[in-house]
Structure formats: C-alpha cells, structure tokens
A protein has these predicted regions:
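Local sequence-structure signature of Cys/Sec-based thiol-disulfide redox active-site neighborhoods
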Residues: 1-25
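Terminal leader/tail segments of proteins
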Residues: 2-3, 13, 30-38, 77-88
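Conserved short-loop catalytic and cofactor-binding motifs
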Residues: 5, 9, 42, 59
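Non-catalytic interaction surface on structured domains
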Residues: 13, 21, 29-31, 70-72
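Generic recognition of short, well-ordered alpha-helical segments
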Residues: 15-19, 46, 66
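Thioredoxin-like thiol-disulfide oxidoreductase module
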Residues: 30-50, 55
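Non-catalytic, surface beta->alpha helical segment in thiol-disulfide oxidoreductase systems
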Residues: 55-87
Length: 88
C-alpha cells in the first residue's frame, strides 16, 4: 500500500501531517511519501485541492488531519486484512 500526504510550507496543520507520516512510515508493508506542493516543479494532482490531503493507493481518504491513533490503527488493520487475504 502507498500513502501519499500532500502538504505546503505555509500550512499551519501540515506539521502534524509530517508527524503522522513519520509514524506511518514505521508500519511494515506501507510506503509513505510526503509531497510538498511548494517544491520546485511539483505538480498538484487533480484530486488535491486542500492541504493536508491523504491519498491511499490513489484514493483520497482524508482532507485535513485524521485523528492520529485511530488513523494509524486503521492502516495497520487494513494491511493485516490484506495479508490474510493473500495467505488464503
């Protein structure tokens, strides 16, 4: 699974998004990318119209920061479910 978190430099809530990204990066099987839309040459995807925006496998799952612990638990549960499905 791939989680992309879109931020900007001037976003007041994006520091929390970076913290969430750092913690999510420790989840086995999850690739996490923080995309700073202020970086030179960075394109803004059509589905991103606010920051922070969380995109999981190409699908927007949160506009704004989700509640951290619940969000991370949900990611772990989804990965565990996918792992179980593959094992069948």
């Amino acid at each position: 699974m791939h989680l992309e978190i879109y931020i900007t430099d001037q976003c007041a809530n994006c520091q929390e998004a970076v913290v969430i990204a750092e913690q999510a990066g420790g989840i086995v099987g999850l690739e996490v990318t923080v995309v700073n839309l202020d970086a030179p040459g960075q394109r803004v995807p059509a589905q991103v119209f606010a920051v922070p925006t969380y995109v999981l496998n190409g699908m927007v799952i949160s506009l704004g920061n989700p509640e951290r612990d619940g969000f991370l638990a949900g990611l772990r549960a989804e990965l565990a479910h996918r792992s179980e499905e593959r094992a069948k």
